[in-house]
Amino acid sequence: RDVERSRGLGDVYKRQVLSDYDFQKIIACDKGLEICQECDILPDLVIGDFDSAKTDIVASYREKTEFLDLDTHKDFTDTHVAISYILEQEIRPDEVILVGATGTRMDHTLANIGLLKQFAEFGISAYLIDEHNRITMTAHQHIVKRTDAYRYVSLLPYTEQVTGVTLQGFYYNAQGLTLKLGESIGVSNELIAECGLIEFESGLLIVIESRD
């Protein structure tokens, strides 16, 4: 698989995530550079205005890898710019993993979940992973594999509604269901089969696998 990673996540769990994938290209956004240092990782590209990362760490990496410096007074976040960079490449990845894109800033967390829409529209599998969740957005059929890491599977419409939802392999299966924005009917389902199939006719769907 051609996999790209943006930023990093914290504490012990980040190392587990970083070891789960064979990354072909690594992009660090601003403070994510500090995670690269902690894990002894050399990113292929560093993007940011560097208003968060420690100055000495940024300086040490400038001698080792490529940088794309951004203006502090820009319209888009560093992560948004990184995603645009990925999608502008002649050869796009099959899968993208974003780590460290959630946290105490709920505005950034919601914005980063929304940015998954760009990958969904290109048909690229993209996952936002933190210590408790694995989040993706899809515009088509999606398969969830059973794993001990995540107990719950929740489906949230990103568009006004997601129509014709069919679920197979779940505790709560469905056929022809409509998920509407502002309702919670898709929250806290569970897999009972090795794989769960999610199909729908129209809309954009957020799929959240949760640890607890």
Locate the predicted segments by residue.
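Acidic/Gly/His-enriched mid-domain segments of enzyme catalytic cores or analogous surface patches
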Residues: S19-Y21, K31-E121
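Long, charged alpha-helical interface segments
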Residues: T138-D212
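Single conserved hydrophobic/aromatic residue that forms the stacking wall/gate
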Residues: D2-Y13
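Class I SAM-dependent methyltransferase SAM-binding "motif I" and its flanking Rossmann-like core
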Residues: D107, K117-T147
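Generic secondary-structure signature for well-ordered alpha-helical cores
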Residues: E88-I91, Q118-I124, E160, L177, ...
